[in-house]
């Protein structure tokens, strides 16, 4: 007859296998339903951006465009995955932390926008079909370089064009859903 310790170990092992199998099913289900939930996630991003859009666009006095057509072409091309991944990282790590410090009245709204973008990134990473990439995007490098050259004004420029970024996300995701 097996010892109680051995029985306990077997039960723990079986519970772990069952839980991981259940988790795998949940993850697959999330990915199955992800295309249907994407429009809602994009609406939430747009609504969150709407709370800070006027502030940043009023502060953006520059005539140039940071998020150019070449970035959209990267989103549409074979580098779409990498461009999207890098741009999400760029906004989360470089733009939004600096944007939060510009006015206490918008800090919570920028933070909320960042949390929604993090949620989107997490969902994209879980569903490898949408973010299976490794290569670097030259267009993203150009955006980052232009952003750096603009110094403090770069935050206003990048945040004022966040709606363009949302549109690029939508273009990329729409293309990936057709695959």
From Swiss-Prot:
Entry annotated with the keyword Disulfide bond: yes
UniProt subunit comment: Homodimer. Interacts with IL10RA and IL10RB.
UniProt-listed Pfam families: IL10
PANTHER family: INTERLEUKIN-10, INTERLEUKIN-19-RELATED
Signal peptide: 1-19
Protein's organism: Vulpes vulpes (Red fox)
Record's subcellular location: Secreted
Annotated GO MF terms: cytokine activity; protein dimerization activity
UniProt keywords, alphabetically: Cytokine, Disulfide bond, Glycoprotein, Secreted, Signal
GO cellular component, one term: extracellular space
Swiss-Prot/TrEMBL GO biological process terms: branching involved in labyrinthine layer morphogenesis; cellular response to hepatocyte growth factor stimulus; cellular response to lipopolysaccharide; chronic inflammatory response to antigenic stimulus; defense response to bacterium; defense response to protozoan; interleukin-10-mediated signaling pathway; negative regulation of autophagy
SUPFAM superfamilies tied to this protein: 4-helical cytokines
Tagged with keyword Membrane: no
Cysteines joined through disulfide linkages: 31-127, 81-133
Domain of life: Eukaryota
Family of the protein in this entry: Belongs to the IL-10 family.
Protein name per UniProt: Interleukin-10
